[in-house]
């Protein structure tokens, strides 16, 4: 009898809790004009809450997740915080517009808010770990007192032009920050000392102070036309840097001795000081660099330095090099004899009169377009699949031994004769002038 009473009381308590959570969800439905939702299956019904569209419950029937993507209009009711077990809230407002004050949600760990979010305040969520938001109006965005926050993603609305300041308060556990298309004149993250990964894309930043980010390992800052100077000298743990598509004239990475990946493509750099013997990939294409010293980078596998002002390039110490693009510089010679692992070479648009490929037996792709090269010996390059000699001065070429070749381009070149194998048939990607003659090599 005693145990029966206990069981009965427990069931009544659970029933009462479910009724309470049911009433909270009903108020949520009415506050956001749920009658206009496209998907509202079982909402306001007597069915278990986990059968309501977008609602997930635990084994006791308590709401742990709300995930809705629909037309919503109104303000999320404050009583939603009384869903004591709610851990995940994801709202994608596809039309309409909603306002939220996420304050004192006791168990909330993940918050995802996208679409027409007109106002967003997030405060005093002691368990919140991840926040991803695309508020329509960042003037009405505020976040504070979320001590467990480790991931923050913010994305601005399309075609936004009004610049704003984003000042992040202290988040001691914040390790990853993503900001996309948010038009900023200033970004203050000096109080986020544990940041390890930063991704800032198309934000029109004019300056970025990362002096307090000593734990930073990954940095991507791209698409900021007004960013001219970037000092990363205190970010000594950086492993990967992508600062492509800015207007950087000064880049300080002198203390980044753990760096393995650097992409500074499409900036306005005239010099680049590198100091990491671990560097595997370097992309400094489309800058104004006149001197590039890579002699100490024995781990370098990928080098992209095309579109600069280089008059010389010494890669003799880079014996692990696999990919090289150095086109459209001022190079008059290029020595690749020590780079036997190269499978990709693009060296067109230079002043090269010749190039020795006798040691490049792994070569699969070769391009010397718009080049004064007159002779090209490919006898050692039996793995070649692609050849581009567009606009070159080569008159004769032997491809009779290249059984893997599927792409050949020689438009606007001086080419007159191609030596081919006995059973040769032109491939689909065969681009030559009409007066070029193919001769069979016996």
Predicted regions span which residues?
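LRR flanking "cap" motifs
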Residues: 30-78
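The feature encodes a structural signal of leucine-rich repeats
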Residues: 76-81, 98-103, 119-123, 139-143, ...
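Leucine-rich solenoid repeat scaffolds
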Residues: 390, 395-442
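Conserved hydrophobic beta-strand positions in leucine-rich repeat
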Residues: 64-68, 89-91, 111-113, 120, ...
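Leucine-rich repeat
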Residues: 59-63, 82-87, 104-109, 124-129, ...
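Bacterial Sec-dependent N-terminal signal peptides
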Residues: 1-20
